[in-house]
Each structure stands twice: as C-alpha cells, then as structure tokens.
Amino acid sequence: MTKISSSDVRKVAQLARLELPEDQIETYTEQLEEILSYVDQLQEIDTKNIPPTTRAVEVVNAMRDDLVEVNCSREDLLNQAPHREGDFFRVPKIL
C-alpha cells in the first residue's frame, strides 16, 4: 500500500494551486491513501489476456449521406448583410 504523508498532500495542493486549510490536510491524506489503495488493487488484476481498449463500450459514428440543398441564393444572403462589398460581407477590423 502506498503511504501518503501530509507533506505530500501539501505539495500536491501547491502544484494544483489549491489553498487547503490545515484542518483538512489529514482528511485529504486519508482520502488519497484510500484512492491509491484502490489503484493498487487494480494493478494486481491480471489483464494479459484482455485486449487494450480506449473505451468500455464500442462507439460507432452514425454518418448520413451529405445532400446538397439550395436554400438561399448568394444574392439573397448578401442582401441581408448590414455591410457588404461586392460579393463579400464587410466586417469591422478586429486587429
């Protein structure tokens, strides 16, 4: 079992830029030890006959065919722009 000290908890909190009250250091120390104990148990499981995976459930992308549809003409869209220049939208300079 991995032993966590209160100084380890303080160091992790510092690295994560967290301010932990002193009265909670012991609580977090115990909780981290429990978590690492659980991870140790997982490390002991024999997984050599289990193929590596990236997720528990296989996900398949449901793709549809792309269909070209004409909804508006270019001119109709450009006529709705507050400012236009030829066949382009004119927008304020941002840089």
UniProtKB/Swiss-Prot annotation:
GO molecular function per UniProt: asparaginyl-tRNA synthase (glutamine-hydrolyzing) activity; ATP binding; glutaminyl-tRNA synthase (glutamine-hydrolyzing) activity
Keywords, in A-Z order: ATP-binding, Ligase, Nucleotide-binding, Protein biosynthesis
EC number(s) recorded for this UniProt protein: 6.3.5.-
Catalysed reactions listed for this entry: L-glutamyl-tRNA(Gln) + L-glutamine + ATP + H2O = L-glutaminyl-tRNA(Gln) + L-glutamate + ADP + phosphate + H(+); L-aspartyl-tRNA(Asn) + L-glutamine + ATP + H2O = L-asparaginyl-tRNA(Asn) + L-glutamate + ADP + phosphate + 2 H(+)
InterPro entries assigned to the protein according to its UniProt record, in alphabetical order: Asp/Glu-ADT_sf_sub_c, GatC
GO BP terms, alphabetized: glutaminyl-tRNAGln biosynthesis via transamidation; regulation of translational fidelity; translation
Highest taxon in the source lineage: Bacteria
Root EC class: ligase
Family of the protein in this entry: Belongs to the GatC family.
HAMAP family: GatC (MF_00122)
Subunit: Heterotrimer of A, B and C subunits.
Function: Allows the formation of correctly charged Asn-tRNA(Asn) or Gln-tRNA(Gln) through the transamidation of misacylated Asp-tRNA(Asn) or Glu-tRNA(Gln) in organisms which lack either or both of asparaginyl-tRNA or glutaminyl-tRNA synthetases. The reaction takes place in the presence of glutamine and ATP through an activated phospho-Asp-tRNA(Asn) or phospho-Glu-tRNA(Gln).
Protein name: Aspartyl/glutamyl-tRNA(Asn/Gln) amidotransferase subunit C
Organism listed in the record: Prochlorococcus marinus (strain NATL2A)
